[in-house]
Amino acid sequence: MELERNCMLYIYSSRGDAPSTAELQKKIESPNEATKAEGMQDLIIGMTQGEAYTRLLMTVIRYAMPSKDKRVKKLTQLYLEIVGKCRPDGSLKEEMILICNALRNDLMSPNEYVRGSTLRLLSKIRQFKVLEPLVEAILQNLTHRHSYVRRNAVMCVYSIVKNFGLDAIPATIDQIEQMLLSEGDLTTKRNAFLVLVHCASKRAIQFILQQRSEDGTGGLGFLLSSGDLFQLALLELLRKVCRQKQQQKAGLLRLIVSILPNTLPSVAYEGACSLLALSRAPVSLKAAAGAFASLLCGNSDNNVKLIVLDRLQECVQRASRRTMEEFVIDLLRGLQTPSLEVRRKILDLVLQIVGKNSVEQLLNVLKRELLRTAEPEQLTVPRTMEYRRLLIKAVHSCCTRFPEAAASVVNVLIDFPGDPDVTTATEVAVVVRELVATCVHLRSRIISRVVDAFPDSAHARVLRVSLWMLGEFCEDSELLDSFLTAVYAACSPLPFTSGDSGGAEGEQRSGCQPKLKMTTRTVVLEDGTYGTEDVYESVNEKGDSSAKAGKTALRKFILGGDFLLASTVAVTCAKLILKTSDEVHAQLAEEFERHREAVQEKAGRRTLTGDAQARETLLERQELEGKVAPVKLRASTEQKTRVLYLVACLLKFLRLSSSGAGAHSDAAIRVCQSLRALCGLMTGLEKEKAFVRHWVHHGRFALERVLALGPVSDDPFTWNLKDAEDEKTVSAPDDLAFFRQLRPDRQSLMVASEGVAAVGEDSLEEDEIYYSACAGLARGAELEEVDETEADLQLTVGGAGGTSPSLSGGNAKDDAALFQQRLAKVQPITGQADPLYVEAFLQVNQFDLLVEMLVVNRTQDSLQNVTVEPSTHGDLKLVERPAPVSLAPGQQAVLHAPIKVRSTEAGIILGYVTFSRRGSSDKECLVLNELHIDVLDYIERRWTCELAFRSMWAEFEWENKIHVNTSFTDVSEFLEHLMKMTNLTVVGFRPPASVMRRLKFSAACAGLDEAERAAGDGEEDEDRYLQSVRKIPTLRKLSESSSFFAVNLYSRSIFGEDALVNVSIEKLPGGKLAGSIRIRSRTQGIALSLGDRITVVQRGLTK
């Protein structure tokens, strides 16, 4: 039978026993067509289930094939498809002559359906002796009047030529080509062209070129009139020919470009993908990007949009920014979709290609979208707040890169600090602070708006940022007077008292006695479980809570225990009053002049040394131009007295507060310093003047260090954009150039890695470094250009974190070191004295884990049926069990067990191995040692900002608390080792530019659809990052001069699970470190796994 070659159906039969041959013969010979059809159906079902029924072939030929009933005819053709046509010796059965005659009659039938279905049957037959007498009839159907017959005739001809060669039908190509010129049915034309593509690609190319020369439109009219199916077949031909014949590539690519604007979406997508895979010319990439942009705006399906955005991301990586900049507005039209993920990817793409020519248009669109999110009807739309935060981050990125364009969005941004969403308001406040520091031409305008919006601020951090901005950059006496008046009014009535809680004391004085109201709320306990707590709140007689009875948000926060805000109010007011002094103004002017001279000297050294890659901050350039200079402010005696009284009231409130502030708290000390500065200004004491000089001068330079240290946005693209442009690695003229293709020990490395990882596919862009805010490209394997990459050898040594040494460049390590690194990961899982010695190597490749086991026969006997039976514990799934092997004495074998990893939950691989000795029927069994999955293999080094960290910390529910227990006595060494062993990064601190440039598209190499992938590439990058962490001033000062140390860390697993870590350490008098490490995550698995990892790491530390 033909079941092994062609079986188009398998129907389950509920009958217990298969019908006998006699029963089926009786039904088939019946004159009733329904009975005959039932018999044919039972015959086909029986044959597909293994019954032979060889004696019924002649019965079917005599009684079923001549039938005119459509159902019987169709069942007969299905029978002919599966029936055996040859004898056991391979010769054709005699009955096939009768079948050929019947098939010929069907090919000449006046019924078009019979002809078409017969042609479909013949395309599935693989015996040429059956087809040979029917070739003439098949070719005659190529010119049949009905398209259904011609369509199937073309596919039948293609099947014959494909299986038996062109010699089976010598004139096939000529007839197909003539058919293409006169065919009107689009599907038939597409089938005919496919025959030329697969059987005679040269003739297909000649046909296309001939149409281009004969058509006045360059072949475009012919192609557009041929339909989308024909165009898809043409694209398949062009991809095939362009890779084989480079001399014709340019003309064929122009043909693809010409058909993109006027085709259906399917053709446009395939054509753009073809251009992307075949060419890197700017014209081709621009045409492909234009087609993708049209598809993005013209489709409503979010899945289509995401796929198109992945392709656009690939265009961005291959093309220059100037080439892609013209598509900024086209991409922004896609923001009309309600999908937040689509919007995020669009904004990421736009931020990568925006330039000076398009930034104004981009900011106008972002401003319009921001205003639209503030409309009342938009507040009910899901995830509107998240979309607003994305827009604000995009505006921040544009303003950071193009400060001259920030004027158009300042007014809109300043309206958002009063937003009810604390994350959005804080993000806007930080953006405005940076604009004030960097955009001198907008400073007075921004400060004026900040003063007006100050009373509307409803969040403590927004108030602190606003106060700091006004204290540093308020350069107008009228604004100073307005601001000080607003602050004094917001803090009134004075003085503060420790018993005052949002107006409760005032109510008591007025005779309105407050009552206590108990509220029960749900909280998350330390162990991650839920609990409840009772909160008592004072309520007045009108039913309003005391917290809501306060006049202003500023007073409410101060009375509620926000002592940092209280100290900020005191410092800001004192600093502004100090700037009104002639002596302080002269000191500030002298300090700025000295700083400007230092900047000029530094710039001169850069010019002399020719260090064109050195970077000057925008603030330094403005100081060189003389745009940043201290301004003399004026304040009335009444304002000075008010400020002194306010600061004194704040100090008294902090010292007498029962909420834990006290006289020795940081906030109280800072307020006391403000009071000393004001007293020094008014009393004129020389000791106090020296304190004022030290206290006032360095605030603005602190902001510069903050802006240089870390990002204010969690958009990774804004972190490394300037670094990637300005801080390029320059090689010395005498540096050696390494070529991977000329390495002498390449073969030895391949031998060392044999059986572990095959050479994979990747783009030819291995020598260029790409990074995107939207990681994870959906790349078509059939369209990718194939080359060997270093990522394959990186995966060979195991680990998703990327710890393998680089194989190219001046820092390339020996292949022997790479082999030693892999050898160190081998773990024995049986003993040396056991009959079978088994050792395992865990090769991690993203979501897959391959257990490679070396099995060695240590006995002098032959061992048969050696079977390793692995099993898994945790979120692991065994994909395939190793096959049994037989081992001679001393022989060894390598077995593989692929395992699918679904999460970072701690997993264990265990099992046993069974075998039997020759001549013995008893089976022996050895229990294997456990293999623990290292969570570090699935945790990547990622970066995030403080705002995103706080938002996730408040949102995540699972928490794992670990007590610090280590022999380290130096905090910085402990932190460095902890980060190195867990792939954690410092929150809010961006990596060096050299690390960011080496971040690759790991999604393109691993085939993942994940967004924002960033992992350190190699041990050198890891060391470079850890060295940069040591230089963070705040961490260095804490570790050197403080007995308490706290830092936030972050990482993400390859499964997209965020891990938030808070390290709080206290240095005891004896030098021992104590404290806790808190881990929070959205899921329980990564919190527990990372906690176990940290516990093992810190316990195993030795100084």
From Swiss-Prot:
Pfam families: Adaptin_N, Coatamer_beta_C, Coatomer_b_Cpla. GO terms for molecular function: structural molecule activity. HEAT repeats lie at residues 51-89, 94-129, 130-166, 247-284, 322-359, 365-404, 405-441. It is a peripheral membrane protein. GO terms for biological process: endoplasmic reticulum to Golgi vesicle-mediated transport; intra-Golgi vesicle-mediated transport; intracellular protein transport. One of its GO terms (cellular component) is Golgi membrane. Its main location: cytoplasm. It is found in: Cytoplasm; Golgi apparatus membrane; Cytoplasmic vesicle, COPI-coated vesicle membrane. The coatomer is a cytosolic protein complex that binds to dilysine motifs and reversibly associates with Golgi non-clathrin-coated vesicles, which further mediate biosynthetic protein transport from the ER, via the Golgi up to the trans Golgi network. Coatomer complex is required for budding from Golgi membranes, and is essential for the retrograde Golgi-to-ER transport of dilysine-tagged proteins. Oligomeric complex that consists of at least the alpha, beta, beta', gamma, delta, epsilon and zeta subunits. This is Coatomer subunit beta.
